[in-house]
Amino acid sequence: LVFLPGWDEISKLRDSLNADYNVSRSASVLPLHSMVSPADQRKVFQRPPKGMRKIVLSTNIAETAVTIDDVVFVIDSGRLKEKSYDAYSAVSTLQAAWISQASAKQRRGRAGRVRPGECYRLYSTSRYNSFAEYQLPEMQRSPLEELCLQVRVLAESGAGVVDVGPGSTAGFLSRAVEPPVAQATDNAVQLLKDIGALTPEEGLTRLGRHLGELPLHPRV
């Protein structure tokens, strides 16, 4: 099981391995990514024929979301593709970044589930020690328009799910265990007002109620 940042790295390594005669005749190279069809994704869980190795090239989805129980060796690049958001420029980016120590431990734990295994990390101990203990929560590295809209929808649903009150979306989110940057919340609320989803007092408009029912970013 090889952990790589994203589809570009997976496809390049797959092509390189398949182009090597010694590898292609003795191993089946299988990518695990949302770009791969469900039928091909299921192949990573099948045992390889006798005399053949199975090489799975995956993103961090194989850390916890799926379990391939016959993995013996793990190769960890130490990288992932992570969405980040600059609250002050209101710009989102998806870029390669170093994983956290928690992710490194999860990746190591994928090896040796059915027999003794090994994990090869393609980074030094000093690099590992520089990793954050955990990845930043998604709420701290994503635009918050969808979340703020859902907060208002739940607050005005009458179901008592959340107690927000008028004009206090930022205050509600600030009580989260790991709250977002205040500027990010302010940006999100302002955008929802600008597109007519919220009133100046942060109440839901008719448009806001309709947008809250759609599985789309409000701006779309």
Labelled PLM ranges:
Residues 1-219:
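P-loop NTPase motor module signature
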